[in-house]
Design a protein with these regions (language model features):
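Alpha-helical adaptor scaffolds
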Residues: 37-104, 109
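Register position in tetratricopeptide repeats
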Residues: 52, 86, 120-121, 153-154
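TPR-adjacent "capping" and linker segments in tetratricopeptide-repeat scaffold/adaptor proteins
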Residues: 1, 29-42
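Terminal, low-structured helical/coil segments at or just beyond the last alpha-helical repeat
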Residues: 3, 23, 30, 129, ...
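Alpha-solenoid helical repeat scaffolds
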Residues: 9, 26-29, 64, 98, ...
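Residue register within tetratricopeptide repeats
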Residues: 19-22, 57, 91, 125
Length: 157
């Protein structure tokens, strides 16, 4: 799986069209979501369903079971970070984002969420730093150049 991820990320760095970027990101997400274990799939799927239904407490419970069963599964941490964020628990979300990125430093979903939270919390410089890190992974991500320019203008102005 790691070689496949490396290949997809190498292609993502040079992808220029939105359709190509989306297809590569979808391929990466598929690999990130693969647990290879029925019980872990059950936790993951139940958590995703709870997220979609707006039941963030239940989602956090399911993702916590997943994390306890396999702490090395980065997507469990990322999904729980999302649930914490949606529940307004930004500190807990940021801690899970940090663990996601420790396990998978290229996690563009976690980077994007981190940048959003930092900006929302008033840390424009931190958000800019994270967005620049994201730009190294996917320089042509739709909307990213505008976000970077807006933040740079805001910080200079």
């Amino acid at each position: 799986m790691e070689n496949e991820l490396d290949e997809l990320f190498a292609r993502l760095r040079v992808a220029t069209t939105p359709a190509e970027i989306e297809a590569l990101q979808d391929g990466i997400w598929q690999l990130w979501l693969a647990t290879g274990d029925q019980l872990l799939d059950k936790y993951l799927e139940a958590g995703i369903r709870a997220l979609a239904a707006g039941d963030y407490t239940h989602a956090i419970t399911e993702f916590t079971h997943l994390i306890e069963a396999r702490p090395s599964f980065a997507e469990g941490w990322n999904k729980r970070a999302t649930a914490y964020y949606l529940r307004g628990e930004y500190r807990a979300s940021l801690l899970d984002v940090a663990e996601t990125l420790r396990l998978e430093p290229r996690h563009f979903g976690a980077l994007s969420g981190w940048a959003t939270m930092l900006r929302m919390l008033g840390d424009q410089r931190g958000s800019l730093h994270v967005l620049r890190r994201l730009a190294r992974l996917c320089p042509h991500l739709p909307g990213l150049a505008n976000q970077l320019r807006d933040l740079e203008d805001e910080l200079e102005g």
